[in-house]
């Protein structure tokens, strides 16, 4: 009787530990996935913001695809809607 109670209790403790470890791994996976997505997103933003919003003057031009308008002192996207 004592042996069966000991084995039952040991089995329940082992089951609890395995379930806890499994949930812990499942919780880490979304965190790792989100951190890798945001890391890639921040790398993209660094490349995109290379010229957009940089201060400019008429002597120092902007990158290709950007213009330095007369009204503002920073580089903006060139487009057909701009005069």
Swiss-Prot record:
Positions of the propeptide removed during maturation: 22-49
Keyword entries, A-Z: Cleavage on pair of basic residues, Disulfide bond, Knottin, Lectin, Secreted, Signal, Toxin
Matches recorded under Pfam families: Toxin_12
Tissue: Expressed by the venom gland.
Predominant cellular place of this UniProt entry's protein: secreted
A cellular component annotation (GO) from this entry: extracellular region
Domain of life: Eukaryota
Signal peptide positions on this chain: 1-21
Family under the similarity heading: Belongs to the neurotoxin 10 (Hwtx-1) family. 51 (Hntx-8) subfamily. Hntx-8 sub-subfamily.
Domain remarks in the Swiss-Prot or TrEMBL record: The presence of a 'disulfide through disulfide knot' structurally defines this protein as a knottin.
Cited function: Agglutinates erythrocytes.
Protein name stated in the entry: U5-theraphotoxin-Hs1d
Annotated organism of origin: Cyriopagopus schmidti
């Amino acid at each position: 009787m004592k042996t069966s109670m000991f084995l039952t209790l040991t089995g329940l403790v082992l089951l609890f530990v395995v379930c806890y470890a499994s949930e812990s791994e499942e919780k880490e996976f979304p965190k790792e996935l989100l951190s890798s997505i945001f890391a890639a997103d921040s790398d993209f933003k660094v490349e995109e913001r290379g010229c957009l919003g940089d201060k400019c003057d008429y002597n120092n031009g902007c990158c290709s695809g950007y213009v330095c308008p007369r009204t503002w002192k920073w580089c903006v996207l060139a487009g057909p809607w701009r005069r």
